[in-house]
Amino acid sequence: YTSNQVLAQNDIAFSSLEEMSTKHEEMNLGDIISDAYIYAVEHAEGYNGDPVDVAVVPSGTVRDTYTKGDITVGDVFNSFSLGIGKDGVCGYPLISSYLTGKELKLAAEMDASISDFMTTARLYCSGLNFTYNPHRMILNKVTDCYLTGADGERIEIEDDKLYHVVTDLYTGQMLGSVMQMSYGVLSLQPKDKDGNPIENLEDQAIME
């Protein structure tokens, strides 16, 4: 690939970074990136066939939007160039982990309750849907939370079930540190497919 190589023609007016930081609602820029996470993992070399239930993208990792017209390799890199992997390649790698249904609901509550104060933690999800009431007490704002299947059907979340979640390394570390920052009040622990806590998230990086 070269920087000016055209990857796609775009006729969509994508959300701006300003909108993502000032409006607490679904944004098409976050949606397309989270959808791309799932596509990348399910088409990666060595994919084990376990479908991805949820992909999570926080607004703080999105560095640029896409304008109408040509979308080049450089445009894509600029939009998501934050961080570096242990392989030395720019951009945080994608990681694969598992969360319980209860933890997915907590992630939704974190977005509903905290992201207005910490806009970089605003979450854009593929597969996870929720509604909230901004006038309710903090950590009690979410009024409905569920998954969406491949055909758009509603899937109820089971609190004790493990769900396959894909995000980038930065986000995985951020979510995993919630328990430490809240002194255990909020518990959100990335796990492997057997439910064992993951000690080093970099070991879960998706490598093509």
Q: What do the predicted segments below correspond to?
A:
Residues 1-208:
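Catalytic centers of hydrolytic enzymes
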